[in-house]
Amino acid sequence: MAKFVIRPATAADCSDILRLIKELAKYEYMEEQVMLTEKDLLEDGFGEHPFYHCLVAEVPKEHLTPEGHSIVGFAMYYFTYDPWIGKLLYLEDFFVMSDYRGFGIGSEILKKLSQVAMKCRCSSMHFLVAEWNEPSINFYKRRGASDLSSEEGWRLFKIDKEYLLKMAAEE
């Protein structure tokens, strides 16, 4: 594929971003867990204080998907802070449609994310990858990523909303 553009997402891209989030969730066998709406994406990413940033990969008209979509990939990220090393870019979701893989789109998205991280003086980029997702693990490792689970023994935890509400109400 000769031409594609990686650009910051706009509010008008929210329906495509949600479509790709659902495709990623399906790829990860978790599609029933997507509760987000287009309205949520719009309010959370394009309001006065955005909770996330997003890059999209757009192809020209001659390379549209069979359904007529021009947005074929995305990366959703935000900034966080580590008290030991400072600013971090956290890559929350990263997906390129299967028919558009192998054309350098994913590599270009990662390059743009790296440029954003360097411009913002981030010390590193963090992200999660499912243990079974060898293609993605290899993609990241070829670009210098290290597996903190095996190298440093970190475990990821979460506290669901139900328990957050319970703790918030405690006296």
Curated annotation (Swiss-Prot):
Acetyl-CoA binds at residues 94-96, 102-107, 133-136, 140-143. Belongs to the acetyltransferase family. Coiled coil: none annotated. This is Diamine acetyltransferase 1. One of its GO terms (cellular component) is cytosol. Homodimer. The gene is SAT1. The keyword Transferase applies. It is an enzyme of class 2 (transferase). The keyword Secreted does not apply. Enzyme which catalyzes the acetylation of polyamines. Substrate specificity: norspermidine = spermidine >> spermine > N(1)-acetylspermine. This highly regulated enzyme allows a fine attenuation of the intracellular concentration of polyamines. Also involved in the regulation of polyamine transport out of cells. Also acts on 1,3-diaminopropane and 1,5-diaminopentane. GO terms for molecular function: diamine N-acetyltransferase activity; identical protein binding; N-acetyltransferase activity; spermidine binding.
